[in-house]
């Protein structure tokens, strides 16, 4: 993969208006060729998406998705600019796919990296700095490793950074940008909630061995009672038989 300089990224960003990470990826995918990188961004719909990113989104849809078996459920709100686009089948399909994506991603808690509180990032850094495999490494190397791990962890937590479940070569963010280019309006995921059946409920542990033993203990008295009943019945029958013999005499 070609080495991409900050100057190249800046130049492509100024030309297309795309984000820095998108520009860097475009250049990497095209071995630093500026013309091909611009075409790549246009094909992905990223340049037009960036131009529309500041426009207000007040319309849209709230979509629900229940996974097979009813054990996982999702509610997600995706906004667009007009009611006309909200009624378009392409927009509805996007919202359904985003809901399914959330259902398939148990680690996702935020929409994008900027939504993550500083306290969460600081806690992640504290955890990584304390790992045993970093103990003997110089501080400057340790810092780079920790930073890389934190960036990876942040991506795991963010919806927009997830590989799209139907095409692993595209992220959810890129999928949305493609739809923006197609429909000509700004589109944003505003909020979502993921439900898991029984989540947060402490389940009572069952001691099956003890349960079987208790059942066996309950059966014993019943067996004794049955034996006593049988003995009593036998004694009654014997007494009746003796009485009949006395009458015959």
From Swiss-Prot:
Compartments in which it is found: Cytoplasm
Alphabetical list of Pfam families matching this protein: EF_TS
Keyword Coiled coil on entry: no
Keywords for the protein's UniProt record, in alphabetical order: Cytoplasm, Elongation factor, Protein biosynthesis
Keyword Ribosomal protein: no
GO molecular function: translation elongation factor activity
Region (Disordered): 215-249
Family classification: Belongs to the EF-Ts family.
Function: Associates with the EF-Tu.GDP complex and induces the exchange of GDP to GTP. It remains bound to the aminoacyl-tRNA.EF-Tu.GTP complex up to the GTP hydrolysis stage on the ribosome.
Protein name: Elongation factor Ts
Native source species: Rippkaea orientalis (strain PCC 8801 / RF-1) (Cyanothece sp. (strain PCC 8801))
